[in-house]
Amino acid sequence: MKLNLASLCFLASIAPLVSGHYVFSKLIVDGKTTKDFEYIRENSNGYQPTLASEIVSNDFRCNKGSMESAAKTKVYTVAPGAEMGFQLAYGASMKHPGPLQIYMSKAPGDVKAYDGSGDWFKVYQEGVCNDISGGLKDTDWCTWGKDTASFKIPENTPPGQYLVRVEHIGLHRGFSGNSEFYFTCAQIEVTGSGSGVPGPLVKIPGVYKPEDPNIHFNIYHPVPTSYDLPGPSVWSGGVSDSSSSISAPPVNNAAAASSVTPTTLVTLSKTSSTPAATSSAAPTSSAPSNGTIKKYYQCGGQGWTGSGSCEAGTSCREWNTWYFQCV
């Protein structure tokens, strides 16, 4: 089969989607879907994720290069109570395990000139939708397989222009400290006469740290039975997905104290902004370049560069595309 130049360009453009990367490009308001990047700031990062080590940068606000497109990005006028959503580009879906959150930040004036350096507050979040007391699975995440995240503009939102930031965190590489962040910002103007006082207020960057236990989080071993969403609680004038508030039993202390050195596990809570103060070492994420690989060490997966064989009595088990482990 011969491919013309246009076909080759198209295949090249969707190649990141094949690897599981994606970008939020469309805004949806009361059921009406806008064009790609019509009201969402386009960024130079494209489909590529921001890794946990990079979330201390100012680019973590609306993504790399987004201010360059701010002036040409339109501002959508919405009323309090309007249903708003973000949709992924080119039919992609969220096939990375992890939570989703939406933040807002009021611009001091024209949102097109606003860099997001002010205060942010959370208006929505999605975590786990099933009882995970028997062990967390990829399909337990509320976002799994979806292409859209929707919420309602809180009724008491003060009028003015805002950045609205959607963020999905892929925890599939969290065991190695490389959780992936997918995020963009929309520009809106809220009408009405709302007099609410949004909060808790946070700064971006600063809302998370790379070493936070719910960011540097091992979803593979021991299999988690709880998870606490990162960041502040949802503003009381906002909405939190009630299906994500299922509580799971606390982590078994014996498992947490085993020789496996897991990432900290904390009680699942939709509104808690402070993870439980449980202490544990960071997970082992690499293996020798050759020779014998010890039990519970990584032995394969997409992007893994080590080599060797699992020690006697163990075998290399595939947990998912990115993580194989000697167990």
UniProtKB/Swiss-Prot annotation:
Lignocellulose is the most abundant polymeric composite on Earth and is a recalcitrant but promising renewable substrate for industrial biotechnology applications. Together with cellobiose dehydrogenases (CDHs) an enzymatic system capable of oxidative cellulose cleavage is formed, which increases the efficiency of cellulases and put LPMOs at focus of biofuel research. SMART domains: fCBD. One of its GO terms (cellular component) is extracellular region. Binds 1 copper ion per subunit. Its cofactor is Cu(2+). Residues 291-327 form the CBM1 domain. Its EC number is 1.14.99.56. CDD domains: LPMO_AA9. Disulfide bonds join 62-185. One of its GO terms (molecular function) is monooxygenase activity. It is found in: Secreted. GO terms for biological process: cellulose catabolic process. Pfam families: AA9 (PF03443), CBM_1 (PF00734). It catalyses: [(1->4)-beta-D-glucosyl]n+m + reduced acceptor + O2 = 4-dehydro-beta-D-glucosyl-[(1->4)-beta-D-glucosyl]n-1 + [(1->4)-beta-D-glucosyl]m + acceptor + H2O. Belongs to the polysaccharide monooxygenase AA9 family. Lytic polysaccharide monooxygenase (LPMO) that depolymerizes crystalline and amorphous polysaccharides via the oxidation of scissile alpha- or beta-(1-4)-glycosidic bonds, yielding C1 or C4 oxidation products. Catalysis by LPMOs requires the reduction of the active-site copper from Cu(II) to Cu(I) by a reducing agent and H(2)O(2) or O(2) as a cosubstrate. This is AA9 family lytic polysaccharide monooxygenase G.
